A protein has these predicted regions:
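Long, amphipathic alpha-helical stalk/connector segments used for oligomerization, subunit docking
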Residues: 75, 79-132
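Catalytic phosphate/nucleotide-handling subdomain of diverse soluble enzymes
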Residues: 59-85
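Primary mode marks residue(s) on the alpha4-beta5-alpha5 output face of response regulator receiver
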Residues: 1-36
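Conserved small/polar residues in nucleotide/adenosyl-binding loops
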Residues: 150-157
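C-terminal, charge/polar-rich interaction regions
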Residues: 39-43, 71
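Conserved phosphate/anionic-ligand binding catalytic regions in large, soluble enzymes, centered on
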Residues: 43-58
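Short, well-ordered loop/turn and helix-capping segments at boundaries between secondary-structure elements
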Residues: 55, 59-63, 89, 93, ...
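Hydrophobic alpha-helical bundle architecture
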Residues: 36-37, 124, 139-149
């Protein structure tokens, strides 16, 4: 059985003729600007960049399931760094979902889920066209912020 435990459905609350009380089912209703922030948080910082990085390395290392990659300590460390260290300081908080909690769920529930048959090969499709949106927003946010830290590489022995 394929099952994904976590779900987020954020919809613009704009129904001129009314709507059922779908929030009782967990749907989050908000304004258009917040919906856009949630999408940007997911696509540009807290999920898709992590998935894309795992996909590329998964293809190179011969993995056939994204969930199996999370058992590799080095790959897990890489996506934790992308999410927490690189993304979280500059992500735009949509206010309706906490970015840190979102990344926690992505790294501890969603990506490691063995019942999601996601493959690195599928996610890596058209990676060259995804890079700008997956990583570009984080890079732009760093360049525009004061939290850009640069440490020169130490010489290797």
């Amino acid at each position: 059985m394929n099952a994904e435990e976590c779900e987020y459905l954020v919809i613009e609350d704009w129904f001129p003729n009314g709507r059922p009380e779908l929030e009782k089912g967990g749907i989050m209703f908000t304004d258009r600007a917040t919906v856009d922030k949630v999408e940007k948080m997911k696509v540009c910082t807290c999920l898709n960049p992590l998935h894309t990085a795992l996909a590329v390395f998964g293809c190179l290392l011969g993995y056939t399931k994204i969930s199996d990659e999370m058992k590799d300590a080095e790959l897990r460390k890489m996506v934790e760094r992308i999410g927490y260290t690189e993304g979280l300081p500059v992500v735009v908080d949509p206010g309706i979902l906490d970015p840190k909690e979102f990344i926690d769920t992505v790294l501890n529930v969603r990506i490691p889920n063995p019942f999601m048959p996601d493959t690195p090969q599928r996610i890596a499709t058209d990676t060259s066209q995804k890079l700008a949106i997956r990583f570009g927003e984080t890079v732009k946010n760093y360049l525009a912020s004061d939290c850009l830290l640069y440490t020169s590489p130490s010489p290797r022995d």
